[in-house]
């Protein structure tokens, strides 16, 4: 299914104060410090998702249209009607982040960006580096020093300038911001930029194309929450254009020790303790997601839920998955 090249007129709107402004990859935060969302100027009845980019083909690496597999063993184990997994790991760079990277780098290309700074826990950095290479851009990717070597090597293979930063994930963000200011380079943050989340909407359309309106629940691992936000926005469009009648419940899964979204939804006070927080789920080890409120709103409006899991549980279910599968 080719869902490319369908754009609409749009503007930025602050999710905190409601201020509207002209869209630009150079605009990451409002004067009130809130993050922007993309709002389209006209309602669309078209089948395709409304997108802020006209030409995806120029940077297309094969992102999207990932397969889904059924797991009868899990259906029996959990006593549920159906259990499916969407295999985002076969995306060009190995993660769902390619959906957002394609949109963000295309937007940057439209504004003649030649060099930029980004930070990541690994997956987004590799993805952004891949699309930057395709676009002929010079990228500086900041990642924690403890990032798995395979991700560091992957970023290097794409030709990016990699910066290894000591300390927790947030330290890489701070270092990237300081570097961009010092060197007068754009900070092209996938966590702050609304373009990145927008690219995730294709995920919803692909599920609808495969299952129509039969999916009742979608479980998503959440660090910054771009996939969950994009999934929610995609389903909003599908409902508005009368292609489906009901939105699936969106469920957020966080790593224990990095669960600010779950904690807030449960009314619990959560304070990040870097000396006592580590997880094998490095891709979602995010202590300060900039779009936390947007993630929570998306979960609530879909009647979903949020939980956190510890490393012991993650390891246990990895083994159980292999046992049930094979």
Across the structure, where does each feature detected by a protein language model lie?
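PLP-dependent amino-acid enzyme catalytic core
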Residues: 1-326
């Amino acid at each position: 299914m080719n869902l490319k090249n369908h754009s609409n007129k749009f503007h930025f709107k602050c999710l905190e104060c409601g201020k509207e402004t002209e869209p630009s990859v150079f605009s990451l935060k409002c004067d009130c410090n809130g993050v922007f969302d993309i709002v389209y100027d006209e309602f669309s009845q078209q089948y395709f998702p409304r997108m802020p980019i006209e030409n995806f083909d120029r940077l297309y690496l094969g992102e999207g249209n990932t397969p889904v597999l059924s797991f009868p063993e899990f259906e029996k184990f959990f006593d549920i009607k159906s259990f499916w997994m969407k295999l985002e790991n076969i995306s060009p760079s190995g993660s769902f982040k390619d959906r957002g990277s394609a949109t963000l780098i295309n937007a940057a290309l439209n504004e003649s960006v030649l060099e930029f700074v980004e930070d990541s826990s690994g997956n987004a950095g590799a993805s952004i580096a891949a699309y930057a290479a395709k676009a002929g851009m010079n990228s500086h990717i900041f990642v924690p020093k403890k990032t798995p070597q395979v991700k560091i090597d992957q970023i290097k293979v794409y030709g990016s300038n990699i910066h290894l930063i000591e300390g927790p994930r947030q330290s890489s963000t701070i270092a990237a911001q300081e570097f961009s200011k010092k060197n007068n380079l754009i900070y092209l943050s996938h966590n702050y930029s609304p373009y990145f989340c927008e690219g995730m909407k294709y995920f919803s359309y692909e599920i609808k194309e495969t299952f129509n309106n039969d999916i009742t629940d979608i479980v998503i691992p959440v660090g910054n929450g771009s996939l969950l936000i994009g999934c929610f926005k995609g389903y909003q469009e599908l409902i508005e254009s009368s292609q489906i009648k009901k939105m699936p419940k969106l469920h957020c899964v966080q790593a224990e020790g990095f669960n600010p979204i779950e904690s807030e939804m449960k009314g619990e006070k959560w304070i990040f303790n870097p000396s006592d927080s580590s997880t094998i789920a490095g891709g979602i080890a995010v202590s300060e997601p900039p779009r936390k409120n947007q993630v929570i709103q998306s979960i609530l409006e879909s009647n979903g839920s949020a939980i956190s899991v510890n490393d012991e549980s993650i390891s246990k279910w990895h083994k159980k998955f292999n046992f049930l599968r094979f």
